[in-house]
Amino acid sequence: MKLTVKGLISLLLVPLFLAGCSKHEEQKAIQPAAHGQAAKKQATVVVPASVQGKWKAVKIAVTDKESNKETIYNVAIGSSFTIPATSLTINVDNFLPNFIMEGTTLTSQTNEPKNPAAQIRIREKGNEIFRGWLFSLYPTTHAFQHPRFSFTLVDFIPAS
């Protein structure tokens, strides 16, 4: 059997061509943060003096997706509340009537309820499963996805 130079080159290039065309994905190595590189900053919540003590509670609608039943609960700001017949507890940490974000600072521009938001934590069987915000005007923004319940900020109660 006599091979020509062209035949020999073809035989050598075919495996290279096939290997080059097959799907091959490289795993990128996770790079550690560079020395001196800043870590992602946590947001800081600042309740202005003009807002402190002006609001006493928020009203949170809890909808049971299985029964399609909605119940509204009043939860005092700075307190926690266990939803009856569940292992869920809601903590309301802060209320900002006119929520704004300035860099990493979350605050209220005024005491007027123009963009109401409640900072909450939800625990199930003692384990925190959500830490975030409920927005009255934008209920689906950053909404917590629980398999059975949904949570919505529906109202807020001023201090006397």
Task: Name the predicted role of every residue range.
Residues C21-E25:
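Bacterial signal peptide processing site
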Residues A29-Q52:
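Post-signal peptide N-terminal segment of mature Sec-exported envelope proteins
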Residues K56-T63, A117-I122:
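Short polybasic amphipathic segments
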Residues V58-P84:
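Short acidic, Pro/Gly- and aromatic-enriched capping/linker segments at domain boundaries
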Residues S79-R121:
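Mature extracytoplasmic domains of secretory-pathway proteins
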Residues K114-P116, N127-S160:
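C-terminal partner/receptor-binding element of secreted or periplasmic proteins
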